[in-house]
Amino acid sequence: MGVTVENISAGDGKTFPQPGDSVTIHYVGTLLDGSKFDSSRDRGTPFVCRIGQGQVIRGWDEGVPQLSIGQKANLICTPDYAYGARGFPPVIPPNSTLKFEVELLKIN
């Protein structure tokens, strides 16, 4: 249970966000069957959030700090690190494992 980081392409390997940092990220969120439920890329606007402060799901709070600037990776988040038994109706069913393709664009 938790979050698994699967590297797609390397970042700079030395600049990592710290808890409390604001980050700018592009992401595509899918269910394990490939159904897309959200995408900053489709909106054409990167997502900005503060990491490690409960503003996003736990999988992001723990997974994003493992990425360096420019890195693209999949974050596989088990339900307890995503939306849990509640899900996010009507888009995300209860107890769903989620896959986010994320790209860390910058630390603000």
UniProtKB/Swiss-Prot annotation:
<feature type="domain" description="PPIase FKBP-type">
    <location>
        <begin position="20"/>
        <end position="108"/>
    </location>
</feature>
<dbReference type="InterPro" id="IPR046357">
    <property type="entry name" value="PPIase_dom_sf"/>
</dbReference>
<dbReference type="Pfam" id="PF00254">
    <property type="entry name" value="FKBP_C"/>
</dbReference>
<dbReference type="InterPro" id="IPR050689">
    <property type="entry name" value="FKBP-type_PPIase"/>
</dbReference>
<keyword id="KW-0413">Isomerase</keyword>
<keyword id="KW-0697">Rotamase</keyword>
<dbReference type="InterPro" id="IPR001179">
    <property type="entry name" value="PPIase_FKBP_dom"/>
</dbReference>
<comment type="function">
    <text>PPIases accelerate the folding of proteins. It catalyzes the cis-trans isomerization of proline imidic peptide bonds in oligopeptides.</text>
</comment>
<dbReference type="GO" id="GO:0003755">
    <property type="term" value="F:peptidyl-prolyl cis-trans isomerase activity"/>
</dbReference>
<dbReference type="GO" id="GO:0005737">
    <property type="term" value="C:cytoplasm"/>
</dbReference>
<keyword id="KW-0963">Cytoplasm</keyword>
<comment type="similarity">
    <text>Belongs to the FKBP-type PPIase family. FKBP1 subfamily.</text>
</comment>
<protein>
    <recommendedName>
        <fullName>FK506-binding protein 1</fullName>
        <ecNumber>5.2.1.8</ecNumber>
    </recommendedName>
</protein>
